[in-house]
Amino acid sequence: WHFLESQEKTVNVIVPNAFPDFLRWMPGAKDIIRYDKYTEFANKLLNEADVICCLDFNALSRIDAMADAVAQSPARKMMIDHHLNPEAFCRIIISHPEISSTSELVFRLICRLGYFEDITKEGAECIYTGMMTDTGGFTYNSNDREIYFIISELLSKGIDKDEIYRKVYNTYSEGRLRLMGYVLYDKMQVFPQFNSALVWLTKEEQSKFQYVKGDTEGFVNIPLSIKNIIFSVFLREDTEKNMIKVSLRSVGAFPCNKVAAEFFNGGGHLNASGGEFYGTMDEAIDLFKQALVKYEELLLAKK
């Protein structure tokens, strides 16, 4: 958005629904249009657009109610994404699953076009934030040395990466911290015989702690700090739709994306994936246990 604005283009950013509060500080965030809140206006913009850039998703199903409007728009469509198996709904597809984040891919694309000098400090802050959050603070999918060269280039734009970290990870509500304590004490089950762990939350439990979107960000990673745990799954009843959101994380060579695809209608990267489950929490937990049994050999494999 910042780059295209610098090229004197008329640009609008539309997202399917609310984004987490910890990202609201970002330059330009106040101008983002929520499709679920301003549907008629968003439909008009999509229908009148010359180009639609589809960022960080590779299937129309990922953008919920916004999918039909994007599909039916006469605009030329371009996908920029880093997830596996892109669908062919765009004329131009720039898909690189080996890249750590779509933000990194956007940076590379701008530089390849010869416009590095046009990246502003505000644009650099957004790119860095996307790279940081999509790699868990550079703790997974981030061993490529070029990532850190890119960070050095972003630093040359005047960004304060320490301040960005604080704004993203150190501005949570009291309710989130109490919810985290509750989860760790009551809602985390460790399966040492499978080197795995499970965390789960119901709608009622989220309501009890005044849940807002983003409050459970990173919860799935917590069990991975336990010695020998290499696979963690977080099941959360969605507060807006009648389904269970599934987050999967792993370390090393364990393919949580295969588990996501086989058991939870999802997919993603080797160490970070997501999915959805339509059923009860008990059924979802049973499915998780079935996955442990099926993948026992890989879960117990020596490095």
Residue spans for each PLM region:
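Hydrophobic helix-and-loop "lid/oligomerization" segment in the mid-to-C-terminal part
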Residues: 1-27, 40-43, 48-49, 128, ...
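Short hydrophobic "helix-edge" motifs at membrane interfaces and signal-peptide entry regions
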Residues: 71, 123-125, 255-256
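Active-site cofactor/cluster-binding pocket
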Residues: 33-92
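Conserved phosphate-coordination/catalytic loops
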Residues: 36, 100, 213-214
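Short acidic, glycine/serine/threonine-rich loops at helix termini
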Residues: 24-27, 66, 89-92, 107, ...
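Short, hinge-like loop/turn segments at secondary-structure boundaries
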Residues: 28-33, 72, 95-98, 250
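Generic hydrophobic/packing signal
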Residues: 27-30, 56-59, 110
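Short alpha-helices
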Residues: 80-150
